[in-house]
Amino acid sequence: MKKIIVLTFALLCAATTFAYTERNILQKQTDMERLKDMLILNQEWVTYPDYVNRKGWDTFLGTSKEAYIRRGEKYLDYQWQVVKATDYLAYERTGDRKIMENPFGTNNSAVAALLMAELAEGKGRFVDQLVNGVFFLCEMSSWANSAHVVLQRSNRALPSYDNPVFDLSAGGIGNMLSWTYYFFKDSFDKIDPEISRRLRHELQVRILDTYLNDDSFWWMARGSHYKKGRLLNNWNPWCNSNALIAFMLLENNRDTLAKAVYMTMESVDEFLNYIKADGACEEGPSYWGHAPGKTLDYLEMLSVITGGKVNIFAEPMIKSMGEYISRSYVGDGWVVNFADASAKGGGDSHLIYRFGKAVDSDELKGFAALMNQKRSAPWSGMDIFRTLASLEIDNELKQTAPQHINQPFTWYPETEFCYLSTKDGLDRKSTR
């Protein structure tokens, strides 16, 4: 194991201040009127097989098919866990958020597993239990985590039924249930049309209407309360990507869809204006999948819904955002950590490969292959978009030669830190 010296020295750098820069990269691509003509309606942009296309799913899933079925089988007899009022109140009373998040998260994991299992098998074996999960979620007063419910107007911990909170959790559930509606509406209607009718209603109220009409959420970076240059983090691309996929899967009125898409562009532009042009992730390497990674998800979806006409992957800033994760890796499972990021990691191999493909980075593709040694079936929990997107490139990733060339010097002048290394890093395997 060779010695590596990695220096992160924000405090030793010249004290140059790099402020908010109004780049507005996305809005420079198009205006609202031109955007309307670009949009692909009626889910014609979806390239995945319909649920009933069994040969299509067998081909798409390949050797991963059985893994999804086995995961779903674990939940065939799952007992859905009630999240009690006192579980929400615990956050206000004692600061305990896990008492609410643990059962809530397990329920959400069950829905995701059942959804993917039924897509994989296609025999209806998982549908009833999937319906149970869908209806269970529809009956909840809120899809937000207890720690975030306080964003509602009352600022209290118990959810208000008429004031939906759009946080990371609500957006993630919106993503998952929008795909559920898209793939299984016809199957649900054969059981009882009320299932899909109720699901569509809850998605409209909690996700679509809330995004369009409530600008009170800080991550949106809009409204009279927002001041340009105020701190924005991974919540912005993460929540906006979830909002965008919901609109893409559910909204087919051209004017409404254009309004929503353009609102996401304005919001994500504020994030891209806030972060530094050098591409470093200020939140640390373990947040890369949530900040640059969710920016990738968002930009891919935006390109898809506009038929490739709104595409900023050629921007050097975007490529630098992607390559930050490979530059942070020093070998043997270690990364250069700071803030509250972990020192162990390297990232989601499929996400890294997708980023490399989008920005044409052989560095990222080779690094993704290095991170993909286990070669397990792609799984991103209730982030169905990311699981499906990972499956699309799974074979390409498996055929890519692993490689991580340790860069001797990477300087991030605006974020003000630098990576310096000697020789080959901690693990010789990382340089192959």
Predicted features along the sequence, with ranges:
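Sec-dependent N-terminal signal peptides
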Residues: 4-13
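Positively charged n-region of N-terminal signal peptides that target proteins for export
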Residues: 1-4, 295
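Active-site lining segments of carbohydrate-active enzymes
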Residues: 156-286, 297, 392-406
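Low-complexity, Ser/Thr/Pro/Gly-enriched N-terminal "stalk/linker" regions
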Residues: 20-92
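Carbohydrate-active enzyme catalytic cores, enriched for enzymes
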Residues: 292-432
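Carbohydrate-binding/catalytic loop surfaces
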Residues: 88-99, 149-168, 220-234, 242, ...
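Well-ordered alpha-helical scaffold segments within catalytic/enzyme domains
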Residues: 109-124, 161, 172-191, 239-254, ...
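Long, well-ordered core segments of solenoidal/helical folds
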Residues: 72-84, 130-148, 197-223, 259-279, ...
